[in-house]
Protein backbone atom coordinates (compact mmCIF):
# COMPACT_ATOMS: atom_id res chain seq x y z
CA UNK A 1 0.00 0.00 0.00
CA UNK A 2 1.39 3.37 -1.03
CA UNK A 3 2.27 5.72 1.79
CA UNK A 4 -0.03 8.72 1.94
CA UNK A 5 1.81 11.99 1.50
CA UNK A 6 1.51 14.46 4.37
CA UNK A 7 -0.78 17.34 3.39
CA UNK A 8 0.75 19.97 5.65
CA UNK A 9 -2.35 20.12 7.86
CA UNK A 10 -1.20 18.93 11.27
CA UNK A 11 -4.52 17.55 12.49
CA UNK A 12 -4.56 15.23 9.45
CA UNK A 13 -1.81 13.08 11.00
CA UNK A 14 -3.13 9.77 12.42
CA UNK A 15 -3.31 9.77 16.21
CA UNK A 16 -2.72 13.49 16.44
CA UNK A 17 -4.12 15.07 19.62
CA UNK A 18 -4.54 18.85 19.40
CA UNK A 19 -7.20 19.64 22.00
CA UNK A 20 -6.99 18.17 25.48
CA UNK A 21 -7.93 19.30 28.96
CA UNK A 22 -6.69 17.02 31.71
CA UNK A 23 -3.72 16.30 33.96
CA UNK A 24 -0.36 14.98 32.86
CA UNK A 25 -0.93 11.78 34.84
CA UNK A 26 -4.23 11.10 33.07
CA UNK A 27 -2.63 11.78 29.69
CA UNK A 28 0.06 9.18 30.44
CA UNK A 29 -2.47 6.59 31.61
CA UNK A 30 -4.80 7.11 28.64
CA UNK A 31 -1.89 7.03 26.22
CA UNK A 32 -0.63 3.70 27.59
CA UNK A 33 -4.13 2.22 27.28
CA UNK A 34 -4.50 3.54 23.74
CA UNK A 35 -7.65 5.48 24.59
CA UNK A 36 -6.40 9.05 24.45
CA UNK A 37 -9.04 11.19 22.74
CA UNK A 38 -8.99 14.84 21.82
CA UNK A 39 -11.50 17.22 23.33
CA UNK A 40 -14.49 18.52 21.41
CA UNK A 41 -14.28 22.29 21.34
CA UNK A 42 -15.10 25.28 19.19
CA UNK A 43 -12.32 27.19 17.48
CA UNK A 44 -11.16 30.77 17.77
CA UNK A 45 -7.92 32.21 16.38
CA UNK A 46 -5.84 33.39 19.30
CA UNK A 47 -2.34 33.27 17.83
CA UNK A 48 -0.61 34.24 14.64
CA UNK A 49 -2.01 32.79 11.43
CA UNK A 50 -0.55 30.16 9.12
CA UNK A 51 0.65 32.70 6.57
CA UNK A 52 2.70 34.58 9.17
CA UNK A 53 4.35 31.34 10.30
CA UNK A 54 5.06 30.29 6.71
CA UNK A 55 6.69 33.64 6.09
CA UNK A 56 8.63 33.57 9.37
CA UNK A 57 9.98 30.10 8.55
CA UNK A 58 11.70 31.34 5.39
CA UNK A 59 12.26 35.02 6.12
CA UNK A 60 16.02 34.86 6.65
CA UNK A 61 16.73 32.77 3.56
CA UNK A 62 19.19 34.73 1.44
CA UNK A 63 18.51 35.75 -2.17
CA UNK A 64 14.75 35.62 -1.56
CA UNK A 65 11.69 37.79 -1.97
CA UNK A 66 8.30 37.21 -0.35
CA UNK A 67 5.05 37.93 -2.18
CA UNK A 68 1.85 37.84 -0.17
CA UNK A 69 -1.33 37.46 -2.22
CA UNK A 70 -3.49 39.03 0.45
CA UNK A 71 -4.96 42.26 1.81
CA UNK A 72 -2.41 44.70 3.21
CA UNK A 73 -3.35 43.87 6.79
CA UNK A 74 -2.01 40.33 6.48
CA UNK A 75 1.49 41.62 5.80
CA UNK A 76 1.15 44.17 8.59
CA UNK A 77 0.74 41.28 11.01
CA UNK A 78 4.10 39.87 9.89
CA UNK A 79 5.96 42.64 11.73
CA UNK A 80 6.43 40.22 14.64
CA UNK A 81 8.39 37.87 12.38
CA UNK A 82 10.37 40.79 10.96
CA UNK A 83 11.36 41.84 14.49
CA UNK A 84 12.46 38.28 15.29
CA UNK A 85 14.53 38.23 12.11
CA UNK A 86 16.27 41.49 13.01
CA UNK A 87 16.97 40.39 16.59
CA UNK A 88 18.29 37.07 15.31
CA UNK A 89 20.79 38.87 13.10
CA UNK A 90 22.05 40.90 16.06
CA UNK A 91 22.47 37.75 18.18
CA UNK A 92 24.59 36.25 15.40
CA UNK A 93 26.91 39.24 15.29
CA UNK A 94 25.64 40.60 11.97
CA UNK A 95 26.46 44.32 11.87
CA UNK A 96 24.40 45.44 8.88
CA UNK A 97 20.89 44.48 10.00
CA UNK A 98 18.61 44.00 7.01
CA UNK A 99 14.88 43.70 6.51
CA UNK A 100 13.20 40.97 4.45
CA UNK A 101 11.94 41.95 1.01
CA UNK A 102 8.15 41.66 1.20
CA UNK A 103 5.60 42.65 -1.45
CA UNK A 104 1.82 42.42 -1.10
CA UNK A 105 -0.65 42.15 -3.98
CA UNK A 106 -3.23 44.19 -2.02
CA UNK A 107 -6.34 42.07 -2.40
CA UNK A 108 -9.32 44.41 -1.87
CA UNK A 109 -13.11 44.27 -2.20
CA UNK A 110 -12.93 44.52 -5.99
CA UNK A 111 -10.41 41.67 -6.09
CA UNK A 112 -12.69 39.48 -3.99
CA UNK A 113 -15.59 40.06 -6.38
CA UNK A 114 -13.76 39.89 -9.72
CA UNK A 115 -10.63 37.91 -8.80
CA UNK A 116 -7.13 39.04 -7.89
CA UNK A 117 -4.92 36.96 -10.17
CA UNK A 118 -3.88 39.92 -12.31
CA UNK A 119 -2.75 41.77 -9.20
CA UNK A 120 -0.66 38.78 -8.20
CA UNK A 121 0.95 38.57 -11.64
CA UNK A 122 1.93 42.22 -11.42
CA UNK A 123 3.27 41.79 -7.88
CA UNK A 124 5.42 38.81 -8.88
CA UNK A 125 6.82 40.63 -11.91
CA UNK A 126 7.67 43.73 -9.90
CA UNK A 127 9.31 41.68 -7.15
CA UNK A 128 11.49 39.66 -9.52
CA UNK A 129 12.44 42.58 -11.76
CA UNK A 130 13.27 44.83 -8.81
CA UNK A 131 15.26 42.41 -6.65
CA UNK A 132 16.43 39.67 -9.07
CA UNK A 133 16.15 36.98 -6.37
CA UNK A 134 17.10 33.32 -6.63
CA UNK A 135 13.84 32.42 -4.89
CA UNK A 136 10.43 34.08 -4.95
CA UNK A 137 7.93 32.70 -2.45
CA UNK A 138 4.26 33.29 -3.30
CA UNK A 139 1.97 33.04 -0.27
CA UNK A 140 -1.74 32.32 -0.40
CA UNK A 141 -4.02 33.91 2.19
CA UNK A 142 -7.51 33.40 3.57
CA UNK A 143 -8.95 35.90 1.09
CA UNK A 144 -7.17 34.61 -2.01
CA UNK A 145 -7.92 31.03 -1.01
CA UNK A 146 -11.63 31.65 -0.52
CA UNK A 147 -12.04 33.26 -3.96
CA UNK A 148 -9.97 30.51 -5.57
CA UNK A 149 -7.10 32.46 -7.11
CA UNK A 150 -4.70 29.90 -8.57
CA UNK A 151 -1.24 30.79 -7.27
CA UNK A 152 0.21 27.54 -8.64
CA UNK A 153 -0.87 28.31 -12.20
CA UNK A 154 0.49 31.84 -12.01
CA UNK A 155 3.84 30.60 -10.70
CA UNK A 156 3.95 28.01 -13.48
CA UNK A 157 3.10 30.57 -16.18
CA UNK A 158 5.69 33.10 -15.01
CA UNK A 159 8.47 30.58 -14.38
CA UNK A 160 9.38 30.44 -18.07
CA UNK A 161 9.54 34.23 -18.19
CA UNK A 162 11.94 34.34 -15.22
CA UNK A 163 14.18 31.25 -15.52
CA UNK A 164 16.80 32.60 -13.11
CA UNK A 165 14.30 32.78 -10.25
CA UNK A 166 12.57 29.75 -8.74
CA UNK A 167 8.92 30.64 -8.10
CA UNK A 168 7.57 28.76 -5.08
CA UNK A 169 3.82 28.86 -4.29
CA UNK A 170 2.96 28.16 -0.65
CA UNK A 171 -0.55 27.17 0.42
CA UNK A 172 -0.91 28.62 3.91
CA UNK A 173 -4.56 29.68 3.90
CA UNK A 174 -5.65 30.19 7.48
CA UNK A 175 -8.86 28.19 7.19
CA UNK A 176 -7.06 24.96 6.24
CA UNK A 177 -6.10 24.10 9.80
CA UNK A 178 -6.98 24.96 13.38
CA UNK A 179 -3.28 24.80 14.21
CA UNK A 180 -1.36 27.88 13.11
CA UNK A 181 1.91 25.89 13.22
CA UNK A 182 0.70 24.10 10.07
CA UNK A 183 2.08 27.19 8.33
CA UNK A 184 5.63 26.07 9.12
CA UNK A 185 4.93 22.70 7.51
CA UNK A 186 3.45 24.36 4.42
CA UNK A 187 6.68 26.30 3.93
CA UNK A 188 8.95 23.28 4.34
CA UNK A 189 6.80 21.12 2.06
CA UNK A 190 7.07 23.81 -0.61
CA UNK A 191 10.87 23.84 -0.30
CA UNK A 192 10.90 20.07 -0.74
CA UNK A 193 8.59 20.15 -3.76
CA UNK A 194 9.96 23.11 -5.69
CA UNK A 195 13.62 23.33 -4.66
CA UNK A 196 14.99 20.04 -3.35
CA UNK A 197 13.21 17.96 -6.00
CA UNK A 198 13.57 20.44 -8.82
CA UNK A 199 16.88 19.14 -10.12
CA UNK A 200 19.55 16.61 -9.27
CA UNK A 201 22.91 17.99 -8.12
CA UNK A 202 25.93 16.37 -6.44
CA UNK A 203 25.38 15.89 -2.71
CA UNK A 204 27.87 16.55 0.07
CA UNK A 205 28.02 13.46 2.24
CA UNK A 206 27.49 14.27 5.89
CA UNK A 207 25.97 17.70 5.24
CA UNK A 208 22.57 18.01 6.92
CA UNK A 209 19.83 20.55 6.30
CA UNK A 210 18.38 21.28 9.73
CA UNK A 211 15.01 22.99 9.19
CA UNK A 212 13.73 25.24 11.98
CA UNK A 213 11.64 28.42 12.20
CA UNK A 214 12.78 31.77 13.55
CA UNK A 215 11.30 30.94 16.96
CA UNK A 216 14.38 28.83 17.69
CA UNK A 217 16.98 30.89 19.55
CA UNK A 218 20.63 31.24 18.60
CA UNK A 219 21.60 29.30 21.75
CA UNK A 220 19.35 26.42 20.67
CA UNK A 221 20.86 26.51 17.20
CA UNK A 222 24.41 26.25 18.54
CA UNK A 223 23.47 23.37 20.85
CA UNK A 224 21.90 21.37 18.01
CA UNK A 225 24.96 22.03 15.87
CA UNK A 226 27.20 20.83 18.72
CA UNK A 227 25.27 17.57 19.18
CA UNK A 228 25.26 16.76 15.47
CA UNK A 229 28.94 17.68 15.15
CA UNK A 230 29.71 15.06 17.82
CA UNK A 231 28.44 12.34 15.47
CA UNK A 232 30.43 13.69 12.55
CA UNK A 233 27.73 15.69 10.80
CA UNK A 234 28.16 19.16 9.31
CA UNK A 235 25.06 21.29 9.83
CA UNK A 236 23.45 23.60 7.32
CA UNK A 237 20.94 25.32 9.58
CA UNK A 238 18.18 26.65 7.37
CA UNK A 239 16.45 28.81 6.55
CA UNK A 240 18.50 30.92 9.00
CA UNK A 241 20.67 33.84 7.97
CA UNK A 242 23.66 32.23 6.25
CA UNK A 243 21.80 29.69 4.12
CA UNK A 244 21.36 30.08 0.40
CA UNK A 245 19.79 28.29 -2.54
CA UNK A 246 22.90 26.41 -3.66
CA UNK A 247 23.70 25.00 -0.24
CA UNK A 248 20.15 23.71 0.22
CA UNK A 249 20.44 21.79 -3.04
CA UNK A 250 23.70 20.10 -1.97
CA UNK A 251 22.40 18.70 1.30
CA UNK A 252 22.70 14.93 1.82
CA UNK A 253 20.12 14.50 4.61
CA UNK A 254 17.21 16.62 5.83
CA UNK A 255 16.04 16.86 9.45
CA UNK A 256 12.99 18.69 10.77
Where are these regions (language model features)?
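An N-terminal assembly and electron-transfer interface module characteristic of large anaerobic redox
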Residues: 1-256
Amino acid sequence: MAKKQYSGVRESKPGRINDLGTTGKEVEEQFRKGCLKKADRTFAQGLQCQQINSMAALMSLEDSVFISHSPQGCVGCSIMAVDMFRVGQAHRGIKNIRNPRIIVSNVDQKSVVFGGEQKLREAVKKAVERYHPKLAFIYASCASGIIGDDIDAIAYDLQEEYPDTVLVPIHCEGFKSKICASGFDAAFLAINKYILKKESVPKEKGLVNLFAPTTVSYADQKEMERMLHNIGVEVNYIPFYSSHYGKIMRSHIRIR
